[in-house]
Amino acid sequence: LRLSGISAFSEKADGEAFLAENHGARETSLFLDGGRQTYRDGVITIRLESALKSPVTGRSPVDAPEILLKPTPFIQSDHPKIRTQLAQIVAPDAPENEKAKRLVSWVHKNLEKRPVLSIPNALETLEKRTGDCNEHAVLLAALARAAGIPADVEVGLVYLDGRFFYHAWNVLYLRQWGGWVTADAVFGQMPADVTHIRFVRGAIDRQLDLIGLIGNIDIEVLEAGS
């Protein structure tokens, strides 16, 4: 991974926008354009959600398919243990934004952060209370779906200690906000800072699109805002 112009970032920069020119990543099968991230003429622009439109109250989640509320083999949002843990974290009648913030904070504070050599599994992560970014993401997705919040996993790169690394985080659909909001339980962020570059969104099968890509791209930072 080669970087240039990266001195414009401070550690875990949380500015409103930055642009990265993508010299190596092919557009095929990647989700580079959508939500807070745009892709035009080889340039990715990412804007923090607070820099976009103001929250819209009462807007229906037309962009949040019903499937993002349902359990999967690895995001077991209907399991009794997941639902019991949810009840211990936040009240069922709490505002949606408050639910999301509490869930992000709980996963951030209660999971030991270390690599796990297995397919990320929300239930197993809840039981073992340990994992890397993938485990944080699937557990947050399961808790959010159990709370009635459409949730998915995003995968790409994140900037840390002067370099970009593979990373996974979440996107939550909040009706009170009026759209998708990123969340990173590893760093306890909602929204996630703008150094998160999304390549794909979805379950483990979508992440297979990244094989051969991570570690073989060059990113040139064109602009960083604060």
List each model region and its residues.
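Intrinsically disordered, low-complexity N-terminal segments that are enriched in acidic
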Residues: L1-V56
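Short, glycine-/Ser/Thr-/acidic-enriched flexible segments
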Residues: G24-A25, S50-K53, V158, W177, ...
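Generic beta-strand/beta-sheet core signal
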Residues: R47-A51, D152-G156, Y173, A183-V186
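Secondary-structure boundary elements
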Residues: G58-G131, L139, R201-L208, G212-S226
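Active-site rim recognition segments
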Residues: S60-V62, A146-I149, F164-S226
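Composition- and surface-driven signal marking solvent-exposed, interaction-prone regions
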Residues: L103, I119, V155-G156, Y166-A168, ...
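Cysteine-centered nucleophilic/redox motifs
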Residues: L103, R129-V155, N170-Y173
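Solvent-exposed loop/turn segments at secondary-structure junctions
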Residues: N110-K113, C133, V158-D161, Q189-M190
